Amino acid sequence: MSHSVRYIRLLPIIVLGLVLASCSTPTELPHTPAETAAAAPPPPIVALSPEASVATMQLPSGYRLEPVLTEPDIAEPVMIAFDGNGRMYVAEMRTYMQDADATGEQAPFSRVSRHEDTDGDGVYDKHTVFADKLLLPRIMLPLDDRIIIGETNTDDLYIYRDSDGDGVADEKTLWFKGGPRGGNMEHQPNGLVWAMDNGIYSTYYDYRLRFGADGKAMKEEIPVNGGQWGLTQDDWGKVWFVNAGNETGPVHFQQHIIYGQFSAPDELIGQYKAVWPLSHVGDTQGGPGELRPDKTLNHFTATCGQDIFRGDRLPAELRGNLLFAEPVGRLIRRTLITVDDGVTHLANAYEDQKSEFLRATDPLFRPVNMITAPDGTLYIVDMYRGIIQQGNWTQKGSYLREQIEAHKLQREIGRGRIYRLRHENFERGPQPHMLDETPAEWVQHLSHPNGWWRDTAQRLLVLRRDLSVVPALEKLGARDSADPRPRLHALWTLEGLSALSDKLILRALKSTDAQVRMEGLRLADARVRAKSTAHTALVAAMRGELKDADPRVTIQAMLSVRRAGLPDAKKMIQATAAASNSVGVYAINEQLWDEANNEDPQLIRLLGVNGLKAYRSGRTLYGSVCFACHGTDGHGAPKPGADGRTIAPSLAGSPRMLGDERATIAIVLHGLQGAVDGVDYGAPMVPMNSYSDAELANVLTYIRNSFGNRAPAVAPETVAARRAADAGRTNYWTLAELTSQIPALGVPRALFKRRAEWKLAANMAARDNSPLEAMLDGDPKTGYFTQDVKPFPLEWLTVELPARSRIVGIDIDSRGEKSEAGKEIGWAPVYSVEISDDGKTWTMVDAKVVGEPHARFNLPAPVEARHLRIAITEKDSWQAWVIKELNLYGDEK
C-alpha cells in the first residue's frame, strides 16, 4: 500500500495568532546516540514553548498545527469535549505523576475547566474552572446544558450544571451509582461516548448505559471491550477501542462490541504494529528490547486517545480514518480502514515510507487524546510532560526509572497544550449555537457533513424528548439517498424517543444501501429482543437477510438473529456459514460458538456457589485488564515483531498460579521483576494492589481455573492477610526472593516422561480385558475401563515410580465416555491421594480432591515419594471408572 507524501516542518511563525508551516525537514533536538549513551550522561530534557515544540513536528504537506489552548490556562490535560455551543471542557489531571514516585497523586486537586471563544475567531478567550477539587477526572460527556463527569477510583457518574451562566458548575447530581473502583488508574474506565444506538459506552465496563425516558440511568450488560484510554465511534455507530498493554493498538474492531469480541485473519496489514518515531529517548517500560539501535521505539507500547475523523474541514483522504496517539513514541498514527469480504483490515497509511502521520523530536510531546471538533478540524491533546507512565511502572530499580533520571524527565510537569490540525485548502467551520436552537433545527443538523454536529443533534433530541419532531424524523428515516448517514441518525433518534415503528425498520431492511440494511438489522434485533410484541414481520426479515449478497450484511444478520434470541439461531447461522464462501462469514461463525465466556459446567462442583460467583467476576476483570499482557487464552499475548515471544509469561500450568496461593497473591500485590522460568520479558509485572482484596481474589480464582488450570478458589481474607503481612513493602518481588519464602516454588512442574517404567495396580476388574498400561500409551482413544465398581468405597489405583520423585500435580483424563442420555461418565466425583515409600504404609496428602471428566489437581504442597495411590471416596450416578490418560507433574528422578 503506497501513499506518496511530502513532509513539512512546522515553524513558529505567528500570523494572526496562528502557527503556519514552512517546507523543510524536522529540527532534531539533541539526543545521545545509542553507542555513546554509556560513555556520557545525556543532557537534561527541557521544555520548549508551544511554537518551538510545533517546529519539531513533522506532518504531510499542506497540514499544520496551531496551538489553541496552552499553559498557564491549562495544566496536565488528558481529554476534551465540546458542548452544543462549542464550549470546550478540559479534564486536567493536575496531580498526575508530579515526580517519579507519584507523590500526592491521589489528592483531590484536579479539575475540569471550561473555555469559550466569545467572538468566533477560533481563539479561546474566556476561561473558567467548571468543576474543581476532583480526583483525577477521566470521564466527560456533555449532555445539554449539563455534563457528566467521572473521577478516578469510582464508577459513580455525576451530572454537573452551571445554572447561572458564570462558567462554574453550581449543581451536582448523582446519575449512576457504580460504587468504588479498584485498580491502577491506567486500568480504569475512560471515554464516555454516546453512540448512534443511544448506548453510552466506556472502556473497561462490561455494561453500557443509556438515558431512560425519566432521565435515570439504565444499565445493560455487554461483553468486555478491551479498551484502555480513549474512545470513539465511526459514522455507522461502531465504537472503536484501543489498548496499550497488549502492544497491538486497536482491538475487537471487526463488529460492534455488543455482539462480542471478534477477530479475523490478516486484520492488521503488513507491519502495522511497527512505529517510526523521530524521538531517540528510550523511555519505554519494556526496556531495550522495545527499541531500535538508535533508541527509537520499534512498536506500539502506549497507544491511546483514538478518533475516527468525521469532520468536514480537512481533506477527504482523512475522513473515516482511525487516528490514535503513541505518547511514548511521540507520534500519531493514521490508519486506513478497508472492508473486504466481510473482514475489516487496518493499515498504516505511511508504512511504505516507514513513517507516521505526525511525529516529533521534542521528547516532551505527549499526545494522549484527540477529537473531531465542531469547526470540522481535529483537536489534539498534548499532555506535554516528562514522565508519561504511571508510578507502578517507574519504581526504583526499573529500566524506566533509569531513563527518567538520566534525562531528568521528572522535572517537566505542569504544562499542557491543545492543538488544532488545519490544512491549507480549508477554512474552519462556524461555531455552533445548538443550545440556543429549537428541536426542529436540531433535526436539520442530522444531515450536517460534520459527524460532531450529527451526534450532538441526536443527543439533544433524545434528551429533550420533544415528540413534535417525530414526523420530520420519520420522513428523514424513510428516505433513500446517496448519503445514508442522516437516515441512520433519524432512525436511531426515533429509537431513542421510543417512537420508532416496525414499518420503518422493515423499510430500512429493504434499502439498496448495505449500511442501511445493517443498521436495520441492529434496530430489529433490539426490538425483537425486548419481546414487547411478536414482531413476526421483523423476525422473517431478519431471517431473509442471512441470504444477503453482501457479506457485511450477512454477518450482521448472523449476529442479530443470535442476539435477538431466536430459538433456531444456531442452526440458521451454521447453515448460512456452510453455504457461504466469505472469509468474514466463516470467521465470525467459528467464534460465535467458541466464546471465552462459555463456562465449564464442572465449575459449580469444583468451586461451589460463592467460588463460581468469584470466578465470573474475575473473568470480567481478566478480560478488561490482564488479557492485554497475558493473552485471551492465558498463554501470553504475542509480542509484536518478536516471533514466538510473548509480552508476559503464560498462566497456563504456571507453578505460581497452581501452587501455594501465597505466591501469586504476593505477586499481584507488589509485582514481579526479573526473569521468569528462564525468560526475561523486559518489563516487570506491575503491582495491582490498588484493587480490592475481593477483586484480586476473584481474578486469581478465575485464572487458577481457566486455560487448563485447576486449583481451589482464593478467598478475599487470604489476600487481606498477605496484604497486611507485606504492608511495608515498596519494591518488586523476584522469583528468588519468593522461592526463599515458599520453597515449593523451586520444585519444577515438568511432565514425568518415564511412564513406560511405571508399575500400575488396581483392585477393580477390567472391562473387556483393557490393560492398565493403556492409560500410559499417549492415545486418548484407548484407556483403562473398569467393570461396574463394587464394592464401594474401596476402589483404588496405585503407581510405583522408577525412583523416589517430587510430585506437584496429577492429571486424570476420563473424557469421551457418555451414557445413552449423552452425559459424560466414567469419572469419580471425589478422589483421595496418598503416598508411600514402600507401598505398604500410606500417608494421606489430600482427602477430598474434586473430580471431573478431565481431573487436573495440584497437591497442597509438593510431596516426595515412590508410590502413589488414588482412591475413589465418593460415589455418584456413574458405574465404572475410565482412565484414558494418567500423567504426573513435578521433579522426576
Predicted features along the sequence, with ranges:
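Disordered, acidic Ser/Thr/Pro-rich linker "stalks" and the adjacent N-terminal cap
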Residues: 46, 51, 746-804, 815-827, ...
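The canonical Cys-X-X-Cys-His
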Residues: 370, 381, 418, 618-633, ...
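Flexible coil segments in periplasmic/lumen-exposed cytochrome c-class electron-transfer proteins
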Residues: 31-32, 41-44, 601-613, 679-756, ...
